[in-house]
């Protein structure tokens, strides 16, 4: 991967042990936070009993030479549409329990500062509404808009009684149907991995937020284990942590921060990756559009996909998704035999 993509941040602070109570990461072993180089780490407090390690990240080709801009299987909107037509049937009952639990959701949403029931919130890529259920704990449902490109996923959201007052619309995360300076909060969980152009989607997040508004993007992290890397590259976009930071910075966000998340029993968020592996936030410092100028969209959604090509890619994607369903099951069984914290 080109070094120019990784120059946005040069320090990573890893925190092990217990973290501040306000983060509600009680006893987590794999929590972490990114901060921009110009920011200082939070001062030690009575509640912070942790060891901090600062390392300098280096541009490397050892993880993968495949650029983030090269689309994987379900970074193609047409193919993702059909993929989710089937996945929506089992998404809440099979996918979420291993990758996106209620505890994870609530922890990941905390940095979004959903502290006012009257604030306007857009949930981009909201799908079945699982993340939205966490949002409406803090915000009046009538002030929340769920947007997704999959009508099949949105049908599941519409069927959820607590979401009846939410506005639910079909739309494109890279071309949002909201005016500039519209929302107080932008939330997107488990969606960036399907965007053909992640930078464009994050630029849109900046545009639709009001001055001082905050974006909270929750997504996967790129694995280090070779087999997990292979399936990640086949299936969908698993960004590196440095890439998240750079995308936010380029879009114009300030106070960009990243923290790792994962089920309490999951070992190896960085080794195997995780569909919901980190939460990234940034604040909009000025009104108006993003300072980042981009050319026209590259993806041609009108161009038909050859049936045989689609079938081949669909089968590869299905195999990769099966792998990422089985990894959490393996981790859960492993934790039952050797609880986390015990030597193997």
UniProtKB/Swiss-Prot annotation:
One of its GO terms (molecular function) is 2-methyl-6-solanyl-1,4-benzoquinone methyltransferase activity. It catalyses: 2-methyl-6-phytyl-1,4-benzene-1,4-diol + S-adenosyl-L-methionine = 2,3-dimethyl-6-phytylbenzene-1,4-diol + S-adenosyl-L-homocysteine + H(+); 2-methyl-6-(all-trans-nonaprenyl)benzene-1,4-diol + S-adenosyl-L-methionine = plastoquinol-9 + S-adenosyl-L-homocysteine + H(+); 6-geranylgeranyl-2-methylbenzene-1,4-diol + S-adenosyl-L-methionine = 6-geranylgeranyl-2,3-dimethylbenzene-1,4-diol + S-adenosyl-L-homocysteine + H(+). Pathway: Cofactor biosynthesis; tocopherol biosynthesis. Residues 121-130 are annotated as: SAM motif I. Its EC number is 2.1.1.295. Residues 207-220 are annotated as: SAM motif III. Residues 63-313 are chloroplast intermembrane. InterPro entries: Methyltransf_11 (IPR013216), MPBQ/MSBQ_MT (IPR044649), SAM-dependent_MTases_sf (IPR029063), SAM_MPBQ_MSBQ_MT (IPR031164). Residues 1-62 form a transit peptide. Pfam families: Methyltransf_11 (PF08241). Residues 166-179 are annotated as: SAM motif II. Gene3D superfamilies: Vaccinia Virus protein VP39 (3.40.50.150). GO terms for cellular component: chloroplast inner membrane. The chain crosses the membrane at residues 314-334. Involved in a key methylation step in both tocopherols (vitamin E) and plastoquinone synthesis. Catalyzes the conversion of 2-methyl-6-phytyl-1,4-hydroquinone (MPBQ) to 2,3-dimethyl-6-phytyl-1,4-hydroquinone (DMPQ, a substrate for tocopherol cyclase), and 2-methyl-6-solanyl-1,4-benzoquinone (MSBQ) to plastoquinone. Belongs to the class I-like SAM-binding methyltransferase superfamily. MPBQ/MBSQ MT family. PANTHER family: 2-METHYL-6-PHYTYL-1,4-HYDROQUINONE METHYLTRANSFERASE, CHLOROPLASTIC (PTHR44516:SF4). This is 2-methyl-6-phytyl-1,4-hydroquinone methyltransferase, chloroplastic. It comes from Spinacia oleracea (Spinach). The lineage of its organism: Eukaryota, Viridiplantae, Streptophyta, Embryophyta, Tracheophyta.
